[in-house]
Swiss-Prot record:
Reported modifications of this chain: N-glycosylated.
Subcellular location field: Cell membrane
Transmembrane segments: 339-359
One BP annotation, GO: positive regulation of cytosolic calcium ion concentration
Tissue: Isoform 1 and isoform 2 are widely expressed with variable levels in brain. Isoform 1 is expressed in cerebellum and midbrain. Isoform 1 and isoform 2 are expressed in cerebral cortex, hippocampus and striatum. Isoform 2 is more abundant in the cerebral cortex than isoform 1.
Listed name of the protein: Neuroplastin
Residues annotated as glycosylated: N170, N196, N228, N283, N295, N316
Protein keywords: Cell adhesion, Cell membrane, Disulfide bond, Glycoprotein, Immunoglobulin domain, Membrane, Neurogenesis, Repeat, Signal, Synapse, Transmembrane, Transmembrane helix
Source organism, top-level taxon: Eukaryota
Origin species: Mus musculus
Residues in compartment: Extracellular: 29-338
């Protein structure tokens, strides 16, 4: 073997050796965590979720275990539906394994250590095996504190009177030091409401439907999770932002929409006027598509038909307080609609030409002179005529 071929042969042998060391598509791979659960502090009545994501070949099995506070060695397995159905376990297996543990309506007894276990060892469920060897573990500590007591005013229903409304919250008991408090509406902090006060008020001077929603008074503490209370401000739907008319050509697609303010979020219904009565759209033709998103609805009609689709459409919003409806007129034009202006101009030109031709034909016989008649009146000597009038007649006798 020549010296020049030695480096190439050596490189090839090294590549083969290294390739044999890498796990192939079907090679076994021990379980490992990609995402492990994180410790949290919660208040009574709240909920928490813990995530566990593992990889391995074959895909590892995932289990959830729990140990009470100060009893870290006394683990018990958690099952879906445990603790009066407050525990939910959702697990999915594919190229990796993912599991979510969720516990709602927390109590003080839910505090403790929660453990995600994963293993793809064939003997992992053999009781003669040591679980600490066949299973890998990731732990999270959940601390549940007593929620502070917050007294709130009653829910409000906005009427047409427009009388001022005052929302009130009072933090009556808390074992933690208050940092600050503020108001939110639908999850958004209201400006100029942040202060360090346990007794909070928010005033709506001229309440309207757009002022309705979920109001929260939120309290932040030095060494505890924030606490909040909810006051619902309700109002009947008020539809805004709709189109009064829509003009489309035959074969095109049409989209009509309605927006509303008011709380709770309404249920939407689309209707079309048939024989003077609004009837709910049945979509028997399969060309109607309705999309509803809380305070927004959309009606789409594809491949418009000039004989079926024109007319008056109505969107209706209804919630527990009241309802509202608005209508939109849909006009569908023929395919020839873009040519109508040109055809109109062409028709005017043709009519004008016909009028001119007819006029010329009627005018020409009157203007041709007759050969038997003199071309003009006879000329006379007007001067001589006047002189003859002044001459006296002489009697020759």
């Amino acid at each position: 073997m020549s010296g020049s071929s030695l480096p190439g042969a050596l490189a090839l042998s090294l590549l083969l050796v290294s390739g044999s060391l890498l796990p192939g598509p079907g090679a076994a791979q021990n379980a490992g965590f990609v995402k492990s659960p994180m410790s949290e502090t919660k208040l009574t009545g709240d909920a928490f979720e813990l995530y566990c994501d593992v990889v391995g070949s074959p895909t590892p099995e995932i289990q959830w275990w729990y140990a009470e506070v100060n009893r870290a060695e006394s683990f018990r397995q958690l099952w879906d539906g445990a603790r009066k159905r407050r525990v939910t376990v959702n697990t999915a297996y594919g190229s990796n394994g993912v599991s979510v543990l969720r516990i709602t309506r927390l109590t003080l007894e839910d505090s403790g250590t929660y453990e995600c276990r994963a293993s793809n060892d064939p003997k992992r469920n053999d009781l003669r095996q040591n679980p600490s060897i066949t299973w890998i573990r990731a732990q999270a500590t959940i601390s549940v504190l007593q929620k502070p007591r917050i007294v709130t005013s009653e829910e409000v229903i906005i009427r047409e009177s427009l009388l001022p409304v005052t929302l009130q919250c009072n933090l009556t008991s808390s074992s933690h030091t208050l940092m600050y408090s503020y108001w939110t509406r639908n999850g958004v902090e209201l400006t100029a409401t942040r202060k360090n006060a346990s007794n909070m008020e928010y005033r709506i001077n001229k309440p309207r439907a757009e002022d309705s929603g979920e109001y929260h008074c939120v309290y932040h503490f030095v060494s505890a999770p924030k606490a909040n209370a909810t006051i619902e401000v309700k109002a009947a739907p008020d539809i805004t932002g709709h189109k009064r008319s829509e003009n489309k050509n035959e074969g095109q697609d049409a989209m009509m929409y309605c927006k509303s303010v008011g709380y709770p979020h309404p249920e939407w219904i689309w209707r079309k006027k048939e024989n003077g009565v609004f009837e709910e759209i049945s979509n028997s033709s399969g060309r109607f598509f309705i999309t509803n998103k809380e305070n927004y609805t959309e009606l789409s009609i594809v491949n418009l038909q000039i004989t079926e689709d024109p007319g008056e459409y109505e969107c209706n919003a209804t919630n527990s307080i009241g309802s509202a409806s608005v209508s939109t007129v849909l006009r569908v034009r023929s395919h020839l609609a873009p040519l109508w202006p040109f055809l109109g101009i062409l028709a005017e030109i043709i009519i004008l030409v016909v009028i001119i031709v007819v006029y010329e034909k009627r005018k020409r016989p009157d203007e041709v002179p007759d050969d038997d008649e003199p071309a003009g009146p006879m000329k006379t000597n007007s001067t001589n005529n006047h002189k003859d009038k002044n001459l006296r007649q002489r009697n020759t006798n």
